[in-house]
UniProtKB/Swiss-Prot annotation:
Disulphide-bridged cysteine pairs: none
Residues that coordinate or bind Mg(2+): 238, 259
Name of the protein this chain belongs to: tRNA modification GTPase MnmE
Keywords linked to the UniProt accession: Cytoplasm, GTP-binding, Hydrolase, Magnesium, Metal-binding, Nucleotide-binding, Potassium, tRNA processing
Cofactor(s) the record lists: K(+)
Residues reported in the UniProt entry to bind K(+): 234, 253, 255, 258
Domain of life: Bacteria
Chain residues that bind (6S)-5-formyl-5,6,7,8-tetrahydrofolate: 26, 88, 127, 458
Classification via PROSITE patterns: G_TRME (PS51709)
Amino acid sequence: MSITKEFDTITAISTPLGEGAIGIVRLSGTDALAIAQSVFKGKSLEQVASHTINYGHIIDPKTGTIIDEVMVSVMLAPKTFTRENVVEINTHGGIAVTNEILQLLIRQGARMAEPGEFTKRAFLNGRVDLTQAEAVMDIIRAKTDKAMTIAVKQLDGSLSQLINDTRQEILNTLAQVEVNIDYPEYDDVEEMTTALLREKTQEFQSLLENLLRTAKRGKILREGLSTAIIGRPNVGKSSLLNNLLREDKAIVTDIAGTTRDVIEEYVNIKGVPLKLVDTAGIRETDDLVEQIGVERSKKALQEADLVLLVLNASEKLTDQDRALLNLSQDSNRIILLNKTDLEQKIELEQLPDDYIPISVLTNQNINLIEDRINQLFFDNAGLVEQDATYLSNARHISLIEKAVQSLEAVNDGLALGMPVDLLQVDLTRTWEILGEITGDAAPDELITQLFSQFCLGK
């Protein structure tokens, strides 16, 4: 996908393929109205007012056959998402009808849009910057209301504003350094001393480091916590999974070894998306299929952000239990003593003090798991502060870290007594790195790669 501006007219189906109440086929470009009009029987789309919805029929211009009864939205440039003429054909939902209309539009001169091309045009035409474009996809992929809140704030420009303001301050500082170098005789320009440059770079660094502190929370809310449910066979792992999901997605029986693979599900725990991984019971076994499941379970444990270790409170600790306690001790772990509704035989004195007694059968203390997750990952603070700007995108986090390193290089140079003018390089690099976040200084290959991750029709 080229990153140069293109003025051909593109089209794509913007709703998921399948049966539904409506389907939407979108057009964007200079000829959007003319192409839509060529297959539309109703009002003249080229004469109706912008941002209106118009009733009519889609017809095959060759045969005159009616394809569907539709409502057509007309939006004229520049007051559209792409800042081009946009037409959206609202059809009855269905694979056949939307595909037929799409093919008609292509035959009439539109080009099939590439993934993310509508949003790419919005970026190229200055409607959104790169962080806002990425926020569009984050909204689509948000699994909880908290993740959606962060994405909407980013789409609204909160992160862009912070980055742009910081870049402007850095640019002002660079300009002041340049004036001092080129025109040292000017008395009305504040001298950029070593002390003043140190003060400014420390101010920039502090701001970016504060932003980085939001990254852990933001990334969790955006991507979720990979959560491994581990334990020896038949201690209630799958029952716990089903309890958290509130539906029967895993096989639950009284036969040890019935979970022979890794089952993954997402669940919303107080606004935090947990990617729950129900692992096969980790034990020695001669069953080849079960052995594969056990190996996958060990891998899931190593990669997990959170480990829920389930023990059977109605039985004494086994060697397998002790092995799992040792295996998971360096993880963010919550120990769950299940089956507390039965007579307890487990040796509590051999366990860490932070276990939670639960009964999946009676739902006892399941809510405490949510509280412990909040304690482990958010220090019991609220998940999202309404006025805060959060980093949640791995690309943004990496670039902010690089920008901080560049500022540290400036401060290190100042500490070594380097002349102010020699430190311009690192300060300029900081300015360029921040520009990659918003797209002002992003390489063409990066922009192409980012938009290729979008879905068709967006």
